[in-house]
């Protein structure tokens, strides 16, 4: 007997009968095939050995970290001062039609003498590059600063014939203070400066200019965790001396012949609590008169001068 679908006047609904079987084109078969040899453990991202290898690669890459972006110095006075101070630069931009004066002429001449690219650009292009800041028709491109690694800084300081002398900065946000401290470190025989990676001044063109060229020969390192770095330096035999107005002793009692790292806090905030706890001693600078505190860079210079004096007399 025929089914209902064969009845006269019956309507066959779509999809009630299976259509022809269609193959997968080999997709299912290929999915069952092998995927090749299993990679070594250190190449597998989720394997413990792979995670250790990735961490080691990141640490190696970070030994000479640079800042994130290049810097653009704007204006005739800042540009000529940077070039006079030997701030490293990659390009000098001059807007077409800019009236030349002594500063612009000197900037172009110094850039040419140092092999810095000199590029003439449309004024609107320079406006865009300067984010509409006041550029006076001239701008200098400064590359990111190449920071040392704290481990390398410690190794180089300990390999020197003189006892290690380093400075660490805590809560220092003014690049001019940083530049002045770098200058003092170079002047008094120090081996370098350590900065925290966050909430700290960076080696910008302003800091470089304030250092009067000392930034070219005095390494600056960035520490991911300043407290951990201070502990590491203490374990390596350095005395950690914190400088604070409320110190327990004065700088006269520092043993300057011992390998030392001086930790300098800001004039306003001083040293943070954890940093104070990681210092072997907290010292202050004796002062006459009502002056309560010194600028951070001045205070650092006074302590470094005292340590240098002791070492000269030894």
From Swiss-Prot:
Keywords: Methyltransferase, S-adenosyl-L-methionine, Transferase. One of its GO terms (molecular function) is RNA binding. Residues 1-70 are annotated as: Disordered. It is an enzyme of class 2 (transferase). SUPFAM superfamilies: alpha/beta knot, L30e-like. Pfam families: SpoU_methylase, SpoU_sub_bind. It comes from the Bacteria. Coiled coil: none annotated. S-adenosyl-L-methionine binds at residues 265, 285, 294. CDD domains: SpoU-like_RlmB. Gene3D superfamilies: 3.30.1330.30, 3.40.1280.10. Its EC number is 2.1.1.-. GO terms for biological process: methylation; RNA processing. Residues 44-65 have a biased composition (Basic residues). One of its GO terms (cellular component) is cytosol. SMART domains: SpoU_sub_bind (SM00967). InterPro entries: Alpha/beta_knot_MTases, Ribosomal_eL30-like_sf, rRNA_MeTrfase_TrmH, SpoU_MeTrfase, SpoU_subst-bd, tRNA_m1G_MTases_N. Belongs to the class IV-like SAM-binding methyltransferase superfamily. RNA methyltransferase TrmH family. PANTHER family: 23S RRNA (GUANOSINE-2'-O-)-METHYLTRANSFERASE RLMB. This is Uncharacterized tRNA/rRNA methyltransferase Mflv_1447. The lineage of its organism: Bacteria, Bacillati, Actinomycetota, Actinomycetes, Mycobacteriales.
């Amino acid at each position: 007997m025929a089914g209902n679908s064969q009845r006269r006047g019956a309507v066959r609904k779509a999809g009630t009968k299976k259509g022809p079987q269609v193959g997968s084109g080999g997709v299912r078969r290929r999915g069952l095939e092998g995927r090749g040899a299993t990679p070594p453990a250190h190449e597998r991202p989720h394997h413990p050995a792979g995670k250790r290898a990735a961490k080691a690669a990141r640490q190696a890459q970070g030994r000479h970290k640079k800042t994130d972006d290049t810097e653009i110095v704007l204006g005739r006075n800042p540009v000529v001062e940077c070039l006079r101070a030997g701030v490293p630069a990659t390009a000098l931009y001059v807007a077409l039609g800019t009236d030349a004066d002594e500063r612009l002429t000197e900037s172009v001449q110094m850039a040419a003498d140092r092999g810095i690219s000199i590029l003439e650009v449309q004024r609107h292009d320079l406006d865009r590059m300067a984010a509409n800041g006041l550029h006076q028709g001239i701008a200098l491109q400064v590359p990111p600063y190449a920071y040392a690694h704290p481990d390398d800084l410690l190794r180089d300081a300990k390999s020197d014939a003189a006892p290690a002398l380093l400075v660490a900065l805590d809560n220092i946000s003014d690049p001019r203070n940083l530049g002045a401290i770098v200058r003092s470190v170079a002047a008094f025989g120090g081996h370098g400066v350590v900065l925290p990676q966050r909430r700290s001044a960076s080696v910008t063109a302003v800091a470089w200019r304030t250092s009067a060229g000392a930034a070219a020969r005095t390494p600056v390192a960035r520490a991911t965790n300043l407290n951990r770095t201070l502990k590491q330096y203490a374990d390596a035999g350095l005395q950690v001396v914190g400088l604070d107005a409320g110190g327990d002793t004065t700088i006269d009692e520092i043993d300057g012949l011992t390998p030392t790292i001086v930790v300098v806090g800001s004039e306003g905030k001083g040293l943070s609590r954890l940093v104070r706890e990681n210092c072997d001693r907290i010292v202050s600078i004796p002062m006459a008169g009502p002056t309560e505190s010194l600028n951070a860079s001045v205070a650092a210079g006074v302590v470094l001068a005292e340590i240098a004096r002791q070492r000269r007399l030894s």
